[in-house]
Amino acid sequence: MSVDHLISPFRDKRIILALSNEIKKLAFKLEKKLVIMEVCGGHTHSLMKYGLLDLMPNNLEFVHGPGCPVCVMPRARLDEAYELASMKDSIVLSLGDMMKVPGSYGSLIQAREKGLDARFLYSPMQALEIAKENPHKKVIYIAIGFETTTPMSASVLLSAKKEKINNLFFHINHILVPQSVSAILEDPACQINALLAPSHVSVISGAQIYAPLVDRFKLPIIVSGFEPVDILESVLMLLKQALNKEAKLEIQYKRAVSYEGNTKAQELVNACMEVRENFEWRGLGNIKRSALKLKEAFASYDAEKVFKEYLSHKTSKENKACKCGEILKGIAKPLDCSLFATTCTPQNPIGSCMVSSEGACAAYYRYKRV
């Protein structure tokens, strides 16, 4: 069944141009440049794909945020995934992009080419079946993502416990959006004065998670959908707040997002996970209380604890020429990087921003090469 009739109004050329004209009229009244961070990689791709940046006036600038979980995963965590795959009788599972990002040993795809058992999953629920089919193997799910995907990992874990599947383990890399944005806004060099907040994250956690950012940093935040009309309407809402010297949290994506979020999904996560005290982010460094871990009651499923002796916990240096860290902070654009589209391409990625389909460099490579 086609859903074109549902999507087409949000891609209507007449509506897009009308919103663009209204944005230009209001932007003319701004006293200073409006620097908008679109936190989510999905927004970055929509801006590029539909040429929305070309419809913006010069005094509106977009900077690309850390809303790509694979992009912000440090090499140490990637190395741990490889080390787990290197164990005897192990099967490592993860979702698509995580398989492609190279750590200091290489990527999980390269591990597979060397004969190690590393597998793509289309759904986290597949981990249960693979564990059942391989009772004498150590099956390790590399769980990654923001608040959006965390309930799925929690559901798999709770199902494994209920079904007494004892050979399935979890390497938890679930991270939290508000804390990463807060770390960026705290930087004295930060010029960002408005935010487009991720909507898929908000479906789960609710728009409420951004309220502390509004209160602390006094800037407007709009939870925006991903279609062109969604984004332009959200920009218009940001402009109106800026002109009225307001700093409020508003939801543009009301057809999917509420203030409270999905409380059932939140309960799943709270049943088995808790906040870590520290977590290292690529490009952003250590951010306190910015990620999740398994609760002690689930320690027997925690790959970091069960297989601690196999994990080196080493740190490895990034390529000095790669600007992925600065791009994730919003202080550089992909075109500022000397490696972009030369040494670093989707076929030969140097940095994680090019590897992930949600990465800013991947978006620029696909839609905005010069």
Model-derived features with residue positions:
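A conserved active-site cap/scaffold subdomain adjacent to cofactor or substrate pockets
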Residues: 171, 189-258
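Metallocofactor- and cofactor-centric catalytic cores in central/energy metabolism, strongly enriched
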Residues: 2-136, 150, 154, 158-163, ...
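Short, conserved secondary-structure transition motifs
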Residues: 174-181, 261-264
